């Protein structure tokens, strides 16, 4: 494309979308924030395969501050009269702090495919079995592991549009029984939306015929709760509460696995989410988890350790993943709200 053609394209695109605030934010993130952050921050972050763990429990899209409020000190930050910063909840885990150590670490991505690519796309991990509710594992690095257990295929709940935590926990225990000599990665879909218990926050702005949720013809219609917040369709407190409820939903299963499975377990996240924070160098508010945005709310994630008897680990080589049904993967990603 020539420079003149590029200018014409930009002008036409601006003319067609100038009144769509969602489009403007996306273009700012893609064309300004992302290149600047790539230049200044790169994709530096914790090398997951090289880190010290036997069992890695991944909470998809869980901000560090949300995790700290809900999982540390028995979830006291989600309880109480005013519910603290993240809303009023009465079903958080009780008891003492379940972790032996805790810190924040920097993730190698601000969205799941970026995190997967940054950690696993270039390697072979024959000592690891990946149990995942997130279909991106098949698309990005499905052949990198000894086995991938695709819970998004076997236990997708069409009524809620996601994989429930208990299905992932059951698959993880089965993998543990089958592979006592392998590292385990257990990737829950929560805290990523859809928000369990909040069907009115599904936002069906995605047509069933669209692939990976390409945009509607109607400008400014929200496709997900983050866009709905950006457009003023829901208030910040309501979204934060639903987001926190997803942590409440997944935490019992995540903590049970971390404490029960043999080995040094770590509970972490692949990325966080923005709820209107501003990302340098532009003053515009951003929402959700745009790729390549290296702001703390997105790339600072929890790293909570549960020490246990170490797991004997043996590398038996990687296995080729059965060719994923691309249409099925696309549909699962669409139902989970992903858009490319």
Predicted stretch roles:
Residues 1-340:
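Catalytic domains that recognize anionic headgroups
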């Amino acid at each position: 494309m020539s420079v003149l053609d590029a200018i014409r394209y930009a002008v036409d695109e601006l003319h067609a979308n100038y009144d769509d605030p969602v489009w403007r934010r996306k273009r700012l993130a893609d064309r300004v924030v992302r290149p600047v952050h790539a230049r200044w921050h790169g994709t530096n972050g914790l090398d997951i395969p090289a880190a010290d763990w036997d069992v890695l429990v991944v909470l998809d899209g869980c901000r560090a501050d949300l995790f700290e409020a809900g999982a540390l000190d028995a979830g006291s930050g989600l309880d109480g009269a005013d519910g603290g910063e993240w809303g009023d909840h009465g079903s958080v885990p009780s008891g003492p702090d379940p972790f032996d150590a805790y810190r924040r670490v920097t993730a190698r991505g601000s969205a799941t495919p970026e995190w997967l690519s940054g950690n696993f796309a270039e390697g072979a991990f024959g000592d690891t079995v990946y149990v995942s509710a997130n279909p991106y594992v098949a698309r990005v690095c499905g052949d990198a592991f000894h086995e991938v257990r695709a819970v998004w295929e076997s236990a997708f709940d069409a009524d809620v549009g996601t994989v429930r935590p208990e299905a992932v926990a059951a698959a993880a225990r089965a993998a543990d029984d089958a592979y006592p000599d392998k590292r385990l990665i257990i990737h829950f879909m929560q805290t990523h939306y859809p928000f369990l218990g909040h069907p009115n926050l599904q936002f069906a702005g995605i047509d069933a015929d669209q692939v990976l949720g390409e945009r509607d013809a109607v400008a400014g219609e929200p496709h997900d709760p983050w866009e709905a917040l950006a457009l003023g369709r829901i208030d910040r407190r309501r979204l934060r509460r639903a987001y926190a409820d997803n942590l409440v939903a997944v935490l019992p299963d995540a903590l049970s696995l971390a404490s029960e499975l043999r080995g040094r377990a770590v509970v972490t996240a692949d990325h966080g989410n923005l709820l209107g924070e501003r990302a340098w160098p532009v003053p515009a508010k951003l929402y959700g988890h745009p790729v390549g945005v290296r702001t703390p709310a997105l790339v600072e994630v929890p790293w909570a350790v549960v020490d246990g008897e170490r797991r004997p680990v043996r590398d038996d080589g990687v296995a080729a993943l059965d060719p994923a049904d691309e249409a099925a993967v696309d549909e699962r990603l669409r139902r989970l709200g992903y858009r490319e």
